[in-house]
């Protein structure tokens, strides 16, 4: 019996950074294929719509791995399939082929960022380093991404300008891939969650607002949940405290108080292990 509700999936579950050790992070070899498998399962269940959360991905493959799992193929000049189409193999790809399942329902992407796919604010430049991309490799990743993005646009009959759509760079370009191949619609993730939990009324009645993130930086203020919450609270003239493992903000608005909870000498791995104690200590010290 076909389901009558929507399905919810996310990239972090199948293609996320949390699934890898630090030394395993390498966007040349990670793939979103598993995300496509999750979506296939939702399609098989007969859902009428899919909400895809695209935070926390370990990939920079433009969503090609997920699209590959769902039916698209990527061929070399001899007509042989390259699968999965990870960035390390992109130089071999000459053409995409195939289509997604005919019964693919509407896909809505809950997206917390407004980054385009390419450029200084793009997927690789902003989020590549946390996924293991070396600074010296950024130009090569950018060039490869631009070529594959153009191939996918041409295959789907979409304008190359799709590459510049705000949010297309989310999750290493997974948003771009699904916008291009599945006509996916982007939803501001922070707005979606805020509406679901009626955050506006809670903010209005609050005295102070406390939020947090692993690393609070300029990208946090480009649509991510904690940054969006802080920005709205400041608009309501609330005092906001942000507790984060690391703080790296270029400009700090008035009434926004930032607290880095991790000692400078502590390793990232130890910080993860000690996060609960560090946060408790920092809050007790402040309040």
Regions found by a protein language model. Name each.
Residues 1-54, 58-287:
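N-terminal loops that bind phosphate or other acidic moieties
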């Amino acid at each position: 019996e076909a389901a009558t509700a929507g399905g919810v999936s996310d990239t972090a579950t199948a293609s996320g950074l949390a699934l890898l050790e630090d030394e395993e992070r390498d966007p040349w070899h990670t793939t979103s294929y598993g995300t496509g498998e999750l979506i296939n399962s939702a399609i098989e269940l007969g859902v009428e719509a899919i909400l895809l959360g695209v935070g926390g991905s370990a990939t920079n493959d433009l969503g090609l791995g997920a699209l590959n799992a769902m039916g698209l193929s990527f061929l070399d000049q001899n007509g042989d399939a390259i699968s999965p189409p990870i960035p390390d193999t992109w130089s071999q790809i000459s053409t995409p082929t195939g289509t997604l399942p005919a019964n693919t329902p509407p896909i809505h992407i809950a997206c917390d960022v407004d980054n385009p796919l390419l450029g200084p604010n793009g997927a690789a430049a902003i989020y590549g380093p946390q996924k293991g991309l070396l600074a010296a490799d950024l130009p090569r990743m950018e060039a490869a991404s631009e070529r594959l993005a153009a191939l996918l646009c041409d295959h789907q009959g979409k304008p190359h300008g799709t590459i510049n759509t705000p949010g297309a760079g989310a999750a290493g370009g997974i948003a771009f891939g699904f916008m291009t191949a599945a006509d996916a619609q982007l939803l501001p993730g922070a707005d979606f969650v805020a509406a679901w939990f009626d955050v506006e009324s809670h903010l209005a009645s609050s005295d102070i607002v406390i939020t947090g993130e692993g690393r609070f930086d300029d990208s946090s203020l480009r649509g991510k949940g904690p940054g969006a919450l802080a920005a709205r609270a400041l608009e309501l003239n609330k005092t906001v405290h942000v507790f984060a493992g690391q703080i790296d903000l270029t400009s700090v608005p008035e009434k926004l108080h930032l607290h880095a909870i991790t000692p400078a000498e502590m390793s990232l791995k130890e910080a993860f292990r000690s996060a609960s104690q560090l946060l408790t200590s920092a809050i007790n010290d402040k309040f």
